[in-house]
């Protein structure tokens, strides 16, 4: 049996008179008269109008037509004819197929939701539960096509640039890199566990020691962490590593790749400028290490103005080593009611630990602010000058520890940009954020952690300070690629000196015994001639999400998890039989 001679986006005027066989899903069915029934037949490539003329068809065919429901799968044989009522909105809109035979290959039951058209009331949970139906919808199917095009573009570019596509293990050793590992018990080695890789980081560095020189991989990675709109417990990563390179070599290669992928996915020439900004500047100006440059609204430091103020809530913060910073919401005076401002205050307090959110409204009648009575006329004037605020603007101020101020105002800046529609959604702004600090002090755990990861090399200008025992303000040879406020890639030049690598582990609180237990195989490899090397990893899902202007990463992944890490379609994760646990020498301590 021939199921089809053409796909449903293929037929044109040149095919008139041909007898064709078509198969697909019934998109819509219209009884336009007692004698005529129209069906839009759909497959991955498009739609074709099928005409059933009752006067020309057998009773058997008519019976089949009457039974048809939307989304039933059918096979049709018919003749291509010119369409009298042409549809310029689809490629096949100049023709139609007059059916001679029809076969229902698979009838469709009552659908849980409408496939064709737009259903604004369709919940994401419903879409994820019936993901195989959701994929039939134009938006999801197009996103998967774009995903394919993106990955093929990556493979073509990397191959032409001399990179080798090398697989690395999925069952590996637990060496936590920040997030929790997903653990897999070993039945054949009782009491031991594999870990699913958070990234191929160690293996790709070992490949450089092995002489591969230029490596890439489209890798599955796994992180057991709290989820957001742009995160998943399992995700796809473009992993890249190169030997005998400096930072500029890697960044130039990545810029070429990004432009090539953009052109192939969007069809547009990607003559984008890749700006560069040190981490310290990004945090100071935008309160974020991944600033969205599509709009202004920068943070302004008021600490020097407030330092000796009689307003103790501000001045004491500065005197105790904190910061007082502000952002300006332009022309927001009439738009931001007290209710909106209260919501903003609750936002920065709840999610970022800020003690509060002060505000100053510049109205046509003067200054309106609960804190105006605590500030001198000179201080208020200096704040307005420093923030460059104008009549109609609203100044928001946070006084707190440095981290709190930056995270709170950085997030508030984004919210202001969205609420005031300051962001050009058709624009793409690339930014390299470079020179991240090596260490970040975790106040809760009372220890230093790696800001990027512990395999990042230290900038030559700061190496002597590090070797002399300094831990604060040690910068690294790092480079994160940010697109429209989303980090789509992160990389660095790596440490390739075993002594320095051991010193980094020591600063992170790992004893020699712990370092040997976790990374002994890795440190041993460095003894046998490790070349200078560096690389980068792209988050495929997040990069595609930004390119396609989607709000959620789940809209570019075929079968994603929810924010709770669940697959609503398969109902994973699920409980398992006690027998399975016994075979793995595991006993659950969880009590419902």
From Swiss-Prot:
PROSITE patterns: AA_TRNA_LIGASE_II
Entries under SUPFAM superfamilies matching the protein: Class II aaRS and biotin synthetases (SSF55681), GAD domain-like (SSF55261), Nucleic acid-binding proteins (SSF50249)
Location within or outside the cell: Cytoplasm
Reactions accelerated catalytically: tRNA(Asp) + L-aspartate + ATP = L-aspartyl-tRNA(Asp) + AMP + diphosphate
GO MF annotation, one: nucleic acid binding
One GO cellular component term noted in the UniProt record for this chain: cytoplasm
Aspartate as annotated region, ranges: 201-204
Biological processes per GO annotation: aspartyl-tRNA aminoacylation
E.C. number(s) listed in UniProt: 6.1.1.12
Subunit note: Homodimer.
Protein purpose: Catalyzes the attachment of L-aspartate to tRNA(Asp) in a two-step reaction: L-aspartate is first activated by ATP to form Asp-AMP and then transferred to the acceptor end of tRNA(Asp).
UniProt name for this protein: Aspartate--tRNA ligase
